[in-house]
Each structure stands twice: as structure tokens, then as C-alpha cells.
Amino acid sequence: MVSRRNYAAITAVMVIIFFLFQFLNMAKDHWNDYSENQYAVDVNELSGADNVYVASDSDELDQQSTGLIPWAKKKCVVCIGSNESNTMGEMIGNWALYMKRKISYYESISAYENAISKKTQDTPQFVLVDPDFINWDDTKQIRSLQTCVENGISVIFGKLPDASIIESHKLLRRLLGIDEIVQESVTGNGIHLYSGFLLGGEAIYKADTDEEEKNQDMDLVFPWYHLTNGTKIYMKGMLEDSEIDVQKYPPLIWRKNFTTASVFAVIGDYMTDATGLGMLTAMLCEMQSYTVYPVVNAQNFIAANYPGMANENTAVLRQMYSQTMRGLFRDVVWPAFSSINIKTSFLLSSMMTMQFDYADAAKPNSDDVQYYMEAVNEEEGEMGYSVYSVSDTSVSEKLSEDEVFWKSTLPDYKFASFYVGESSDEEIQEALDSKFLQQIRTVVKGIDDTSDVIGYINNQVTKQNALIDGYEHTFRQNLRIRSVETALGYTSILADISRAAYPQSDEDGWEKLSEKLMANTITYWKPFSVFSGTTVSQSDSRIRRFLSLNYEEVANESNNKILIHASEGDETAWFVLRTNGEVISDVAGGTYEEIEDNVWLIGMEESSILITLKPSNTLFYYE
């Protein structure tokens, strides 16, 4: 039997616990100020397209004496064959912009040689060759590439000419490090990416199950070469025949070392889209004893067309989910997003569509706005705006209706981010010109194969391309993710909820979509968890800093010190440092965190930072 004293004590404890819970809920509601958007600012006060740094001959920073060696300008790069409008030429142009390098284009090797002889072209660090624009019948052009290597200029073949051309030119085979052409074409059953080239480690792109076969979108038909001594393979094809020595598998990406420079070869079309950004960066790192380069450091997760504020498509949703759209979004979809937020470093950028169908009778309900705004805010996410609709409604009509609803519901909240999907440039600009969206600072575009991953859509508004569909993860997409993470420290996952809201088949059911989404986001980005999870507006701030950044570096390798001096900015400047076995012992003026072996993320908190390295205790075997 409980005594009166114990009963009173138990009652008092229960009352205290009750009021504590009540107080916590009240405090949470009080502190959760969702009525105003912290990211919505006057975009004219932000760094704009006019501030983007483009490398030139006269680049100079406000330099001070280093006590090491004189500051040296970053070497330029050259593209032969492709121009800015070709896919490979466009890719290296974007790479040069992101890496703060000056780039020159030449239609032929002879045009490049002419510029060198007239001294109108500085000696580049490397030359990227697009073989589609080279006359291989002219052996003088091959000798010219050999001369480049002899003069200390590395040569990158963005892809290789046909095996028949290579077979007919002994000098070209010697330049590429090809000893024997085994077969002009062979069909493999997978591709092996070695560790230490792209960030993310080793990868085997081979389908061992029927389910994995759905992910196999790599080109598995390639020529088969045997290489000479002095070559290093970064990626190779895999063959079905188990009797073939693995060391003799067909190489797909490799380097041939010469005394003065290197020649890199790529088989396939990997250098024509964003995948090429990371591959060029990895090759640059292979040319140098250490490499420091700027990155964005932003990882985005975008829930496009979520939430919706109108109860639409009810008959279809009841049949598939036994739910209305309101129930689907609140009770089924939201828990999945909350779980991703907990289990990963991603922050949620939710792109609201107030209505999907403007032709039906359903209208948006203001009662749900508070729920979603509070929920997203509690997860430290951001609520943006989507222009998407399923009805034949013009952009101006949609904006007009949405503005009326929003002004009567949450008038003080101004949208700062804008999901445009596949909208045309004219439609995007029409929306940005509207009063309703006057504080938009960044636009999120749909998934595109272009290498133009980030940039400006107009003078004051940035653009961020979605890189990957969260509901699928093919082998080629995985390679693309690794490449963009290597080059930019950036990713952008897109989960379009309109598929679940307006399903076209059972494959669009949320149960199947969420299963894939959870597996993909939790699994494939683990190697890149050091990079920061951001909302798209936070990412926007980092993109502006990244694009406006100018920096210079100087090193005294005998003392294992690297000094970096950068242009000033409101945001932290982020860099990746890759070494050949050394590890960081100290960073004065900044922070550092290891991404993987020999790779660090550097945060630059002052205008100059000094990195001190030391030998690693790990044994390394050099080729």
C-alpha cells in the first residue's frame, strides 16, 4: 500500500513532468519563428554575376612577402579541337572557370603552335585534345603533341581516335603508351574504377543480379589495348572470361609517364558532361606533388513540388494509398523526409506547390501551411516555391493565383528559392520579374547532363542544377556524383513528389519511391559526409563566394608548408587539399577535416592560411 507521503511525492513528480513537457512545447512553438524567411534578402545587395572571377593575364592579389618563394600565377590550360560550344570544349571551359584558370581554344594543333611561336600563348600546364577535330593523317600533328610533352606540357586525350587510326600510327601508340592492340572492339561485363583517382574510393560497376542489371548504363563495348611500362591505370573494363589475367583487362583511363610530363588517355564519352569536371581535377592532381583547389562545399536535398496545399486527385490517391493528398503528404511522405534528415547530413529544401491542378475545383487550404512551415523549420530546412503544375496553366496565371492565396495566409514570408524544373528561360525570367518572387536569390533547375552545374541565371540570381534523381541510382550516375564531388564538393539530389501525387503507374507509388530514395541517400553519399549539408539558399551563399573567389598559393616543399592567400568575402572560402602521402599537422587561419586518405577539406577563415604538412606514418608504394 502506498503511503500518503509517497503518493504526494509521485503526484508532485508527475505534475512537474507534465508542466515540463508543456513548457517545452510552448518554448518550441515560441522559438519556431516560421513566419519570416531568414534567407530572403535584397538580392541587389548580394554578390552578383559581375563579381564572378574569370582568370586573365593581369591577375594580381594584394600580396605580402611570404618568406617562402615568390607567388606564382596558376598555369593556363589549352583545348585543341573543341570550342566553347562543343560538349568537351564547354566542359573544360566550365572547369577552368571553377578552377580559376585561364583557358584558350584552338581549332587545330598547328594554330596552337603558331600562337606559341608568336608568344601570344603562355605555356599551359596541359593540353586537352578532342580527337574528333584532329587530322590524324597528318603525322606532323602527332609529332607536335610529342613536342608538347618534351617541353613539360602534359597532354590529355579527352577520348581516343578509332583503334584503326591508333594501329596505323606507331608514334601515336608510343605517345599513348599502347604496346599492343588486342582487339579493336570487345564487350565487357563491368567497369572497375580504382581508388585514389576520384573521391569516394574504389567502385565496381558490374551487375551481378537482375536488380543491379537495371543500374547498368555504362558503355561496355570498348577497344582492348595492352600498355607499355611506365603507365598507371585508373579505370579498366572487366571481362566475362575468368581465365584472362585481371592485370590484362582493357584499360579505359590511364596515364603514360615521360621524364618531362604525362599523357592521359580516356576511352569513352566521360569528358563531355559534368563527369569530366572531376576527371580533369583528378588528372591535375596526378600531375603535381600536391594540389589545392577551391570547392563549394554544399550538399543539397530537394523535395520538389512538396508540400501541396490543395486536396486534389482524390479518387486516384484513395485507390492507391487509401488517403487524400493531405493525408499522403502529412502522414506518409513527411516521415520519410524527417528520417533522411536524421540519418544523413542533408538539410531539406522543400519546394511548395500551392496547387497542382488549377483547372479543378480544389483550392489550397491555409490550415496546412502552419504545419508544414513549422515541420520544415524544426528540421532546419527551407521552404521554397515551385512553378510546377499539371494543368495547362500559364506561369503568369499560376503566380497570380498563388500570390492571392499566400498574401492571405503568410504575407510576411518571402520565398528565396525557386524550383523551375524544365521551364524555359523565358518562363523563368517572367516569374523572377514578378513582384511575388522579387526576393528569389537562387533557382533550382531540373536534372541536366550539362557540365554547367552552378552559375548565374541573371545578374543577381544564381542557378543550381539538380544532379541526380533520388529515386534511381545507375552506375553512370554514381560516376557522375563522384566526379562532381571531386571537382566541386557539391551535390544536389532531387525527389519530385509530383510522381507520388499524380502517379502514372504502380512504380510511382510512394512505397516504392521512398524505398529507393531512402536506400540511395543513406548509402551512396557516406564517403562525402565531411561536406556540409545545406539548404539551397545556404548553398547559394557558398556558390556566390566560390564563383567570386580569386586565390594564389605558394609552397616550400622542403619545409612542408603551403600558404594560400584569397580575395576577401563574407563567407568562408573552402578548398580541397590532395597530397602524395603527407598529412596535415596544422592549419593556421583555418580549419581542416580529412575526407579520405591524402585528401582534406580546408576552411579558410582569414584572408591567408598557412598549412603545415608532415610525413605520414603509413607505408606507401609508389609506381
Language-model-detected regions and their locations in the chain:
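Surface-exposed beta-strand/loop patches in extracellular or lumenal glycoproteins
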Residues: 214-224, 562-583
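A glycine-rich, often tryptophan-bearing local segment used as a flexible ligand/cofactor-contacting loop or short
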Residues: 136-207
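Metal-dependent polysaccharide deacetylase catalytic core of the NodB/CE4 family, i.e.
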Residues: 77-81, 149-151, 157-180, 308-311, ...
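Active-site beta->alpha N-cap acidic-glycine motif
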Residues: 268-375
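C-terminal beta-strand-rich structural cap/linker in extracellular carbohydrate-active enzymes
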Residues: 139-140, 596-623
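A glycine-centered loop/beta-turn motif at secondary-structure junctions
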Residues: 75, 123, 215-298
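Catalytic grooves of carbohydrate-active enzymes
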Residues: 268-269, 290-310, 341, 409-413, ...
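Helical hinge/lid and interdomain linker segments adjacent to catalytic or ligand-binding clefts
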Residues: 81-163
